[in-house]
Every structure is written in C-alpha cells, then in structure tokens.
Amino acid sequence: LCLLTPFIHFKNTPNGVFLLHFNTMKLLSKLSLPFIFFTALLTLECAAQDWPNLNRYREANKAIMEMRKNDSEDARKNWVVFMGNSITQNWASLDPQFFSENDYIGRGISGQTSSQMLLRFRQDVIHLAPKAVVILAGTNDIAGNTGPTSIDMIMDNIKSMTELAQANQIKVVLCSVLPANRYGWSPEVQPADTIIALNELIKDYARSKRLVYVDFYTALVDEQKGLNPNYGRDSVHPNLDGYKVMEPLVVKGIKRALSRP
C-alpha cells in the first residue's frame, strides 16, 4: 500500500522532503477527489507504521518477564540479551540450542540499523533486566537501510546504547561488524573499508571505557575483505559454520564482562 503514496518516500534532508511533497501535490491536483481521499488514508496508515519495530518482541518480552518474575538473583546471573540485526536474528534461528542452553535471549531484527536498535533498546534490553547485553550493529547503517549515515553517527548510537545499559547495571559486550565487501540489496555501496574503519572506532571506544570487545571480523574475513564463503551463504550473513566460529568468541567475551566488578 505504501508504494501508492509517493509522499512517504522521502530523503532524510529538508530539500528532499520538500521536493517530493511538492511533486505529489502537483500529481494529486490532477486526480479525482475520491482518489485523493483514499491516498490520504493510505498515507496516514503508512505514517503510523512501527519504524523501530517495537511490536516485534513486545509479547515475547512480556512472557519472559512474567515467567521469570519470581526467579532468584542467582537464577538471573547468566541472563544475556543479544541486540542486533538479521545476523543476530538468524543466529537464534539457526542455533537455538546455543541460546537456550546458555540462557541467552535473541533480540535481532532483520534489516535494522543502529538508530532503530537504540529506539527499542529500553523495551528489548533494559526491561528484561539481563546481566549483560551483546551489541552487534552497524552493517545495515553502512548499507544505507535508513538513509545516509557516517561511522560517527553509528558510533553515537552504539555509545548511547552502552550508556543506557551501564546506567541500568547491565554489562556491555561490543562486537565488531562482520566482514562484507558487497551488499546484494545495495550494490552501489562498497562497504569493506568502511567496516574496517568502524571496527577500529568500536575497538577504541571499548578500550577507553574498559568494555569487552569481541572481534568476529578477523575470524570470518577472507582475502577480499569479505565474508569467508566457507562461513556464509551470501556476502553478509553467516551460515551455521560461521556461527560456530563466533560462538566461543562471544561466550568468552560474556564471561569476561560478567567477571568484572
């Protein structure tokens, strides 16, 4: 339905919004009143969409909190939430036993950028009161999924999620962005060097704040600065073998984070 309403397809700049709105009004001026009314209703419906996808885990979060409300502090000692995008979502789907056996909670949403993760961080992480959070974010930002961005903007979102976690006594594990030298859905983007630069910023920030940094990149990269084909079904997403490489790395990182005062 949203494809029928050009009004909502805007660029994240004031000029872009104005131009698209102007062109739409010129078009609608030539159309019948019923069509204009119908289009307006569609526009309102699209505008009301859940951009950060807060609804994705809302019921699951309620169920977890209800189920665990009487758990002791000792029973909560290993609760860990994984915040991320499709890489995290697929992880929980391809190897659910890894999550269930370790008391890990997957909160990945396909296609999400760090801006969207930040908006749902309170609901999908803080309200669950985990002992630690694993943050894996950035590749969809670089792909431009929610508009133009920079590695500094991505870092601002990662820093904000970190600060929210720490303010609520949640340990933080920051992860490198996985290697990728192309995005099938954004072929015009050349991400390899940007990912390397972003990972350096994440690593430096983790060091400066005495946080745990987990380096997935080095373990998964190939000679072309992309995802090793042995570990991924495409240029971005790990397969089960890839996740099996990642798992001991993140477990070690979580243990280090939980052992710190």
Show which residues each predicted segment covers.
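N-terminal amphipathic/hydrophobic targeting modules at extreme N-termini
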Residues: 6, 12-18
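Hydrophobic residues within membrane-embedded alpha helices
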Residues: 7-8, 124
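Bacterial N-terminal signal peptides that target proteins for export
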Residues: 24-34
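Bacterial N-terminal signal peptides
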Residues: 34-43
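Serine-esterase "nucleophile elbow" of acetyl-processing enzymes
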Residues: 47-132
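Alpha-helical cap/lid subdomain in secreted, periplasmic
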Residues: 96-103, 118-261
